[in-house]
């Protein structure tokens, strides 16, 4: 007997405003339960300390979560100067205290160093793996393992304020950039040490900041559903963004209705204006219904890479 799927078949992207003090996986599981979704995944973890934008992909949208993981991010960070911790944030133990003694010119010079393309050695307190185990597990046991420097790109690093011993910055960066590491390295360049005391992700890809919703707001809506005998589809589903927003920066290739069945069965098809070596967003027919992503194959045809399961929306 086939195993019955649990939860609703609901597809879309929720822009969660994660609270501080919780893991990204905890937040993910809460969202999945609130929506009663059969499938859910996030698009790149935030530290428990951090707050802000955590896109949650539901249903078929999980097939495209990697593209949000690879997207640029933007953060607002406040660093406490004069103290260095073993985790580079306020969750760790203070390992060194020094006087704060630098000029605005020295700060400007230090900030300029981090702008553009650089190489960054990841923190030991990160989820990157060494021999199959996350680095933070080694760190908790007091073991330091070798890490290779990785290329990052800081597109913007804006000075916001310096009030007492607290420095606030706005950072727009590429995937894989560790803000805690930038903060720690900056503190060493300034000669006083520093660690993160506030970190908020304000943007992922081009998603709007104003569309975020918190777990508390979701819980209140679920309570409303139960109290007023409404449905989740009526109350929660309007919060979801279309799943193709995860790949909205890809060129759209529209496939006509007559060849759509061949494509949806996994067969390459002939289309016009197909770019070389680029993933494209595939839509069908005059309705331009999003069905997945594809790429030109060696024969110059559009080959599907990730296709969604088409369902009757009324059946969800």
UniProtKB/Swiss-Prot annotation:
Keywords assigned by UniProt, alphabetized: Isomerase, tRNA processing
EC numbers, comma separated: 5.4.99.25
TM regions (residue ranges): none
Catalytic activity of the protein: uridine(55) in tRNA = pseudouridine(55) in tRNA
Root EC class: isomerase
Task of the protein: Responsible for synthesis of pseudouridine from uracil-55 in the psi GC loop of transfer RNAs.
UniProt family annotation: Belongs to the pseudouridine synthase TruB family. Type 1 subfamily.
Protein name: tRNA pseudouridine synthase B
